[in-house]
Amino acid sequence: MKKTGITLIIFLCTFIFSCNEKTRDKSVKELSIFEKVESVPDSIKVDDIIIYNLFKYQILAHKNDSFDSIMIIDKVYNKQPKIWKELYGVLFDHDMFATEKGMVKWNKEIFRNKKDSIKSRVNTLLDCKFDSTLNASLAGIKKLTGRTPKNIRLSIILAPVEGIGFGGMENDAFILDLLDNNFDVINMVEEGIPHEFNHFIYEPTRENDPNKNTPLRLTIDEGFACYYTYKYFDGKISKSEAVEQMTDDDWNWYLQHEKEVYNKCSPYFFYEGDEDPLRGLGREMNAPKTLLYWLGFRIIDFYVNKYGPDSWKDIYNLPVNEVLEKSGYIQYIDELK
């Protein structure tokens, strides 16, 4: 075969291969957000946990440059009405969240106004394989504690207002808001789920605790969720990272102000009013992150250092005041200058 013939064959093969590659790349790159979320299941069920992917229909309602208000009402509003009527409707705006008209109005605007952010954060969620992480977190808490959370209903949503991120009012009215920029999506999935799982298990054990409605209970509850997350990752994250992704500077701020933090907080430990005094103190002191999370973690860490590496499991059974008293933390604070 002549050299020109060989060259032509090589050129054609290269051209065809290049076209095939471009076609494959194009099909991947041009897969729209609508095509991606269409393959997302409406819900995921693991044991007594159900995840409702409400964001799926908040996006699909905008497919084909139109807006399907019936889809929003049927697949988003009526699917989990409690989060809209009793959570967002109470905390933010009743007409906006607790009525069909209000829900349709803001859902009609949200995709147009926040399209880039929605695409980015939804893609991040899909890439981090949320369902696998959920299964791993559940297996982890079963192994570590011998307990499993009950009656959990978590809705993944796109909300037009920030302020909740990952949380809720009761086990069956929890949300993960993909659009809350105060939270990193991967962190919410990988570290937020273990944290919340411990809340779901710990809170039912407070039923007979005489101080279940006090700031001390909230402090121990949040600190314990952070401590469980630290144990769950078995040394792969630091203590500071387990407490709301604190930096070393954040942590050191608390160490430098530790006596002041405790002395300002402790008079409110058994307060039973409607306010949230410890969060207010955190703002007043310009404390980094959330003051009561760090303080609760610190108390539990002292308890574990005193009673042994597996003693953190005692916290599920002890009244919160007993955790504080037995931890030795009060004595430590008294000795600080």
Each model region followed by its residue ranges:
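C-terminal motif of bacterial Sec signal peptides marking the signal peptidase cleavage site
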Residues: F15-S18
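Post-HExxH zinc-binding segment in Zn-dependent metallohydrolases
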Residues: S27-H62, N213-K259, I330
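Acidic/His-rich structured neighborhood in mature extracellular/periplasmic domains
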Residues: K101-E244
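Sec-dependent N-terminal signal peptides
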Residues: I6-I10
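Pan-zinc metallopeptidase signature
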Residues: K85, H257-K337
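Non-catalytic architectural context of zinc metalloproteases
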Residues: R24-D131
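Positively charged n-region of N-terminal signal peptides that target proteins for export
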Residues: M1-G5
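Bacterial signal peptide processing site
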Residues: N20-K22
